[in-house]
A protein has these predicted regions:
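N-terminal assembly/attachment segments of tailed bacteriophage virion structural proteins
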Residues: 1-154
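A signal for long, low-complexity, Ser/Thr/Asn-enriched, surface-exposed stalk/shaft
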Residues: 157-183
């Protein structure tokens, strides 16, 4: 079953960054996504969060799609097999955060979404054979900001489930390349 998330919420620091961008003081630079298994109460004020309650992993942002003048979809791929280390213990994905760079404070939790109770996806530990992935489309408010930048790596990894081979897909000086990785 796919996880069902409530509407994302801008944190107070995210709202402050948005105000700076609307005033022309900065560009909103989205840096990464994170997932965790923190639990929240129904009346909890998510805007006061400065971090996930129980962060388990971080992920590079893959793409952004403008929905309208105030919202964008940010896409990222969650995986239990990453260059930064394989996931050792599985977890239920109960919280997802999007981070951004504030010119005055550094990296901040910009927005947060929590899953509906008992509607969580499960990210299993990596089994040393085939990775598990979850593709996330995250609706994000950028309300009237003149410029939004997505910080993402210039390469991504692809796994062939049939052969178990790993490939790098990337962009180098405007050219797209595809290369098998031997470990």
């Amino acid at each position: 079953m796919a996880g069902i998330f409530k509407e994302s919420v801008l944190t107070k620091k995210g709202i402050a960054l948005l105000a700076k961008a609307q005033a022309g003081r900065c560009t909103i630079k989205l840096t990464k996504a994170a997932a965790g298994d923190g639990s929240y109460t129904s009346g909890e004020d998510l805007t006061t969060r400065t971090a996930l309650k129980s962060q388990k992993q971080t992920f590079p942002l893959t793409t952004t799609t403008v929905q309208n003048a105030t919202n964008v979809f940010v896409k990222f791929i969650m995986s239990n097999h990453q260059d930064s280390g394989d996931l050792k213990n599985g977890y239920y994905v109960k919280e997802i955060g999007i981070f951004a760079t504030d010119p005055d404070e550094g990296e901040i939790l910009y927005a947060l979404a929590i899953a509906e109770t008992d509607q969580w996806d499960y990210m299993p530990a990596f089994n040393d054979l085939l990775p598990s992935t979850i593709i996330i489309d995250f609706l994000l408010e950028v309300s009237n900001a003149t410029d939004v930048t997505i910080q993402m790596p210039n390469k991504q990894y692809a796994y062939d489930d049939t052969t178990g081979k790993k490939y790098i897909i990337g962009i180098d000086n405007g050219l797209i390349y595809f290369q098998e990785v031997t470990e």
